[in-house]
Amino acid sequence: MTNTPFPLELQNISCAFGEGPRHVSALNNVSLAVNPGELVAIMGPSGSGKSTLLNVAGLLQRATSGHVLIDGASASDLNAKRAAETRRRHIGVIFQNYNLIPTLTVGENVGLPLELDGIIDREAVAIALREVGLEGFDNRFPEEISGGQAQHVAIARALIGSRKILLADEPTGALDTSTGDAVLRVLRQRVDSGAAGLLVTHEPRFAAWADRTIMLRDGEIQ
């Protein structure tokens, strides 16, 4: 009987910056696996390595040692181009600062990950916007929508293409509680549909949306 690989697995991840007296160890031998349909919250004090862990998992930052596995295949040694391709196809990332391109419409912002791979799919854009409650917003520009709506656009961009891994770094940080709950509800629904999710948050009420919570301190799981 063959074991199905985890959508996302981190094996013995360590990450350090600087040299000599400026050397900083951000992560120390961290291992973590996320199942399909599971949302894992990562909590810990400022500087504990939460965002570094998410960046390594999202192939946005290379670990000093260890392996990131996507569906059982190591992605740690991919060059920058291949890492970006893998991220666009398999991983949706949501940040606190939604980073919408102001000169693109909402629909163009959402469809950008597909367009970078040469795919124009207006139906997929419409589905992603409908999923986050922004049906009909395609032709608006970022300056014409609220901060909460902009974060929902960022989520739609992360969801497009049925990605199997969703990573969220303090996605509710600039939002009020009710809007933050709405953001987490959308993330939770996609995870319940089979995606694997990692959520970095400092708010216990938002971590409550997760299936389990991991505490980081000084770059290590407690």
Model-predicted segments: where are they?
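ABC family nucleotide-binding domain
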Residues: 5-8, 13-213
